[in-house]
Amino acid sequence: VFTGIVEELGVIADREDLTDAARFTVRGPVVTADAGHGDSIAVNGVCLTVVDLRPGEFTVDVMGETLRRSSLSDLAAGSTVNLERAMPASGRFGGHIVQGHVDGTGTIAAVSPSENWTIVRVAVPGTLTRYLVEKGSITVDGVSLTVSAVGGSGDDSWFEISLIPTTLNETNLGAAQPGTVVNLEVDVIAKYVERLHLGSGDSGTPDGVGAK
């Protein structure tokens, strides 16, 4: 599990296209400092497994399904990516619960800078809008953010996030422009609540739940 607090801006050092897959070598001296083979590292919000390590670099394999469902398909040598190691048991939740399982992609629709922050509007698929609430959590390219506004309907839906200078400087969202595709992961708690609601008509009740 991750927290959505980016530890490092990494750089794609190499991309090798395979049969319905791709292999990326990523430069990231901070996240590789204590990494081991088989560890999980979130790359732009996608949980990936380390398959090889070199000093300051790690390699991950990305299957075709992940490439199709995320913006990782757009990455090339030189691309900057947000990196975060899996949270240790003794770590703090600086953001919110992030699984690294991308629910879909959005497209930056507008970037509106102001003196102290920048408002970014993201066009989002209609299938994800039911999970978006004002002041709720959303993960954008692996960054834990608070939804500041929600609008539109269906596939014309959008949400806005307000980015402080630290976020702009320390993540790749600082370079986002209209048309940039970003990975989105909605709050997992919202998905569990929906699932429980849909199953509320089931006759069975788990032991200990509602027992008297």
Regions found by a protein language model. Give the residues of each.
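Conserved loop->alpha-helix
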Residues: 1-212
